[in-house]
Amino acid sequence: MDNNTNNKHAAGGPPMTFAMPMYHDFVPKWIRPWIYVVLAFCFQLSNGMYLGAMNNIVGEWGIMREDVQMCLYATLIGMALYFPVLFRMKFRFSNKLLLMMSAAVIVVCNILATFRMPLPLLWALCVVCGMAKIQGTFECMSTIQLWMTPKRDFGVFFPILHIILLCSIEVAGYLAAWFAFDMHWTYMHWLVMALMLVVLLVQALLTRPFHAMPQIIPLKGIDWMGALLWCVLWLQVAWLLNYGDWLDWWHSSDFRLVMGTMLITLAVCLQRMMHHPKPYIEPAMWTYHNVVPVILLIGVVEALFSCEHVLEMVYYEEVMHYADHTYEALNQWSLPGIVAGCLFSIGWLKLMRWNVYKLIALALVAFCIYAGGFYVLVDSNISIEQLRIPILWRGFSYAVLCISFMWCLHAIMSFEHFFQALSVFNVLHMFVGGLVGAALHGRGMKYYVADGFARCSGYVDSVRLSARAVDFPQMMNGIVEGFLAQSVKILFGWTLIAGLFFAALMLLWDIPMVRHQVKHIPAWPVVGMRVLRGVQRQRRLKRIRQLRRQRQ
């Protein structure tokens, strides 16, 4: 992506007039967009099941951790699956109806999710909940987009959007763990239901039906059968990667059976994509320049970030013996990093308009600081406060990478295929990349723990336990904790090396083989003056827009 492309997409279009005609006249204009920000945050707090209360759900229902995790992946699949039809829904139904229906569906799903039901039915329920969640969030954020950026500048919109998305994920995890610790895990479901009732009340009392298009566009031409096939395929992929380690991969007949059916489903999906007149995901989406490398890089980065859910959890639960509430409270230190990463992305993409590939490289360097911090700190005798700085860097890195990848897709694709690409992007971004990385990290944990026992067993055999009183169970518990901490440290080291490799790769991505002219890097005072001029330019544009509104 060259600088001209960056400038073209960063500049946006001419300023547009922002209005929210769906509100009744008695609602003050200044508060209208803020109400939708709160509603978007409420939608993002919702889920089918909440992983912050995973251990409590596992203990009460007598199921496995993988079963609860599969509920999360089903919710994410529902969100990813729904992207290609978001605008079709917006152009067919009114804003009020879409928000009220999304809130009502989430209420029903959260009520039913508190009952013990067959797992396939629970997963289907989570898929529907994910669809309602993304529909409500999209309707809120697309309505106030012009309020956030009058030129529809995605260098501003994507960072602000991710402040809401990523912060709500962390807050939801903490609330679920807090309710499970102090009360009962179902209280999180009741809180979400109460928030959805607030959404319904706001829409019923403050708004009226309003269509985004003067003429209603019907839903004809949508490949619903293709959407169902892709949903089944992604559920099969999630099941294989989620349960593969527990089933011992190819040694299980169930794993081989689901793998065979997954390959058949994949073949049917590809055949329909190539021959259907209007497939749900069009083959033309894959023909854009650099789209395949970007999507593959998304999967690789998510695989690296899986250390948060595998290595950190092993360290917290098995070595440090932290409860879920303690871990989620510690995880809130990623919030300052998330906000800082989003604001930094605005400065990079909007004010300075620098190359996005360098921004990805910088985010990977921040990830390396996080991985290196854990590599240095992992031990059974550290203070919990020492882990705050690496977690902050993790939040910064993840926020910048999410924004950068969405910016890349927006820059290289037309609007016609952008939301189809977002669907594939979110499949890799939300669960496939993370599950592949989790499988690799889990395999590494098994190898290094077994290797540690093999190396130590000879020394244990030579110890004369009868020579003095020894609490053998306590001694073995300390040895196991030491091996687990050592394995986590080793795998963080390998993750650090991989992060440095991909950071260097991104720095070299768009460097030509032969440089005909050398561009000198300006001194820091010059860079500071450019940043200051960018801020002043934005202030002048803001004053001009305010004057235009006053004249109107």
Feature roles, as predicted:
Residues L81-N95, A180, G341-K358:
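Helix-to-loop junctions at the C-terminal end of transmembrane segments
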